[in-house]
């Protein structure tokens, strides 16, 4: 009996200890006693060879409350953002530019394969370029040796003989090694790549490696949200990026341990700005900082069946480049050609799919076979004005993205919203019922107010382009576009986030009886009816100034 009691007591202590540890891990998102919010620009910047990465301090109270972290990535033309994965699900919005993104799902086949014809054409082009270079060099030498004609002719004859000898050797080698080439010649094969452009939303699950490349004619800019409080993150609440190439720097700079920023400098980018690369003395034994760097070089070479020099290249030894590198020439990989007709066909398919979902009342008729793991659809474009879910010709438009539009969001438990408001347009006062909202200002400006449960305005600020602010769950918020209009993108921490409005045709006030309004607000019944029916719009509201201008 005594042994059973001791065992029960020990089990109870272990259970309480685990529960306390779990509560301490989740304490940041449970302690949302926010007295002040602020729209901020990034706090930290890493300068790379072909771009930059900026991050917001995730240790701020509002980020801790929402359980998120955020970064902004700028990739210059012909820049390659090296492969990496994160401990948390990511939602990426393409603010500007176009490019290519590749996501690697372990165990899935390489469905993009180079044909033998294209491979031969590539080799022929390389050989043709070499011959042209040789001809140009030969012409230069001939022009410089015009006075020594006899000696030049002798050298030409010698070169012709050497060229014939080389050609004979090549022909003999090609005739003697056809089977060897067939055995060891490997054409390029890789997993699917995806074209990305402005307005795209890309979902990346935790632990899935991805890379991106800017092949456009302007900078490629993307904003990333890391949902660090997700159940998919079994580590702590700190965002972590695991790079598989290069010599990367810590993007979030271990901001919980970083030096405090001086007052008056909050929100100013470049506080921790550093030149691209990393001093060798900060590294152990001259190794890099990617995942391969920590392995023993000999053991890594044996595992990959390569020589140690190749293994050291994977480890980033003697490589000063960090997260974003510049590609020499053009990045050549297998991708299907895209003409105007193909793009239009893809857009029509997306519109048809959207109409089918609307006809089904927003219901996703899933049978478990509509998408396989290896063919998951990772992106959706919500930048097209024709895709708007809410539109007012005098106020603006709003587009939403959730698990009905992009099924992978059900797995990640994230959703998104993009809005464009005209000058003085108002986003109806509302509260987020089941999610936090992380808002990034794409263009323009707006006045934003956020109110807590005590009726205090914990945010009352004019937000500007490039800033980010957080609206906690259930907190009231109102936004009015400024003179430049207001364009934003909002990350939502729930797969099907929705709001309750305080003004408009579908608002909380419209749903109450007249007598309840009259008694609650000490107004007459006539005033109660005016309060309910004076606003016929739903969410995108025109201002009184706009209505007077129209009249």
Swiss-Prot record:
Pfam families on file: Cupin_1
Modification(s) after translation: Proteolytically processed from a single precursor to produce an acidic and a basic chain that are linked by a disulfide bond.
Gene Ontology cellular component?
A: extraorganismal space
Q: Keyword RNA-binding: yes or no?
A: no
What are the boundaries of the region Disordered?
A: 111-194, 238-293, 311-361
Q: Where is this region: IgE-binding?
A: 118-132, 145-159, 161-175, 225-239, 281-295, 510-524
| Limits of the Cupin type-1 domain | 37-312, 380-529
Task: State the CDD domains in the record.
Answer: cupin_11S_legumin_C (cd02243), cupin_11S_legumin_N (cd02242)
Q: Where is the composition biased (Basic and acidic residues)?
A: 339-350
Which keywords belong to this entry?
Allergen, Disulfide bond, Seed storage protein, Signal, Storage protein
Q: Where does this protein have compositionally biased stretches of type Low complexity?
A: 114-124, 132-148, 168-185, 254-275, 351-361
Q: Which GO terms describe its biological process?
A: protein hexamerization; seed development
Q: Where is the motif named NGXEET mapped on this chain?
A: 367-372
Where is it made, tissue-wise? Expressed in seed (at protein level).
Q: Where is the composition biased (Polar residues)?
A: 282-293, 311-323
The record's note on quaternary structure and interaction partners says: Hexamer of two trimers; each subunit is composed of an acidic and a basic chain derived from a single precursor and linked by a disulfide bond.
Give the family from UniProt. Answer: Belongs to the 11S seed storage protein (globulins) family.
Name by which UniProt lists this protein: Prunin 1 Pru du 6.0101
